[in-house]
Amino acid sequence: MTIQLQKPDITELKPRITVFGVGGGGGNAVNNMITVGLQGVDFVVANTDAQALTMTKADRVIQLGVNVTEGLGAGSQPEVGRAAAEECIDEIIDHLNGTHMCFVTAGMGGGTGTGAAPVVAQAARNKGILTVGVVTKPFHFEGGRRMRLAEQGIEELQKSVDTLIVIPNQNLFRIANDKTTFADAFAMADQVLYSGVACITDLMVKEGLINLDFADVRSVMREMARPMMGTGEASGPARAMQAAEAAIANPLLDETSMKGAQGLLISITGGRDLTLFEVDEAATRIREEVDPDANIILGATFDEALEGLIRVSVVATGIDRVAGIGEQNIAEMRAAAAKPLIRPSAAVAPAPAAVQPAHAVSQAPKTVDQIAQTIRSAEAEMERELGFAAHQQPSQDFRPQSKLFASSPAEAPAALRPAQPVQQAAPAPVAQAPVYHAPEQVAVPAPRMQQAQAPVYQEPAPVGRQPEPVRMPKVEDFPPVVKAEMDHRDRATPVAQEERGPMGLLKRITNSLGRREEEEVPSDMMDAPSMAPQRRAPLSPEASLYAPRRGQLDDHGRATPSSSSHHDDDQLEIPAFLRRQSN
């Protein structure tokens, strides 16, 4: 009896990486990576367009939405693409079985990529697969609607992946020129995806002095939001520094930087001529850009095809956490800087000005508030003594005119002196001038407003109001009764000027004849005009103020007739030869 010994089958334990292309943009990225010859990766393409699936180079394809779209595409509607992916969710999960790391690539802004990519990523995440999203944003010339759909799809995909890399197609203009073809430009965008995948696969698959396992990669990229990914190649004396600089500055990524990164994965690949100093120089340059406490994982491998060249690939993660803290600090600094700017504007407005003293009381000592209160009260007293009376005079109807035409100018200060008790005690103005009691009561809150606004308007001192305490009245300021009297005086002015001139011979004769006719008028006719002034006197209570200026003139500015004076004038002014002729 013979015993046959057979070696047991050993299951190969190695990480399995899958690149899942969704939609038209994801399928094109997979085709470019297959053309370049990326090894150690499985490719899967899913699309709602049956015609696009026939042109793919991948061996594993998924027709999304057989019942929803019937192979005609999503029509740039993300809802249709999402429904198509949910219809084939079981087939998607089957292709993800046994995968340790999945790259989900798509072009955002369309229907299938925008709607189906989050579904595929969520399915991979639910199975515990390290999920990395690599998506592109549309060009600006594709319109605002497509850009808005892309932004919404990126926000939805961010919730379902561990790490998300966004490549705006508009950034292709940074590296393209007028001779760059359209296909070559998209190949440059796919190079970002290729470099990221190759960076990880080379460290785990290829021969090297410093090899990494998949657990190291997972510790760097798990739950790290948006990363920064770049690759640089250089040759010559300073090739290590040049390659590191090119890897740090990736012009295609969406305005990201390695500043403050929490996780860093560095892959340095070169020929057999790679030296220790070059590795140290490249790694040190990259380490200067990240956080001092960052988790840095370094790998160095050899590639016979890179004789004379050096390739440096970098994957930096955890950038959004530091950026969020930096934005918060910037917001706090802006808020702190904006506080002193609010106080001057609040001092000008009446409402915030009342709040500002309360804020000052909580910060300043009480002695400062007492001094400020004393200064404000003193300024308010000066305002009331010097300027308040002059401001309140135009609001009254006739009192300024009575002060202006008063007989003695020394009475003006006496009239101003009662202004102080009028503002403080209410009964005083009632006893002196009951007619103007209402305007003076309304004007009482005015000093309070001046006290609230006194700290703001300190420049115009009250001394400037002393040269002109009383304003010259205008015709419009007079009441209707005085306006009528002024009109009559203007009309009677030429007549009065003629009578005041030197009297000629004919004027004296006519005056003497007119005066004799006036003496013969009956007493009833003479009493009628004399009664008119007596009846009109009560209508103008201020008429007595004009009495010193009128003298012997009537309301029309003419001299009042007198019988005795007329007779004396006849006897004195008429020559003797005229009296003989008249006799």
Curated annotation (Swiss-Prot):
UniProt keyword Translocase, yes or no: no
SUPFAM superfamilies according to UniProt: Tubulin C-terminal domain-like (SSF55307), Tubulin nucleotide-binding domain-like (SSF52490)
A molecular function GO annotation: GTPase activity
Annotated spans, Disordered: 391-425, 510-583
A single BP term in Gene Ontology: protein polymerization
One Pfam assignment: FtsZ_C
Compartments reported by the entry: Cytoplasm
Described function: Essential cell division protein that forms a contractile ring structure (Z ring) at the future cell division site. The regulation of the ring assembly controls the timing and the location of cell division. One of the functions of the FtsZ ring is to recruit other cell division proteins to the septum to produce a new cell wall between the dividing cells. Binds GTP and shows GTPase activity.
Family according to the record: Belongs to the FtsZ family.
NCBIfam families referenced in this protein's UniProt entry, alphabetically: ftsZ (TIGR00065), FtsZ_alphas_C (TIGR03483)
Protein's name in the database: Cell division protein FtsZ
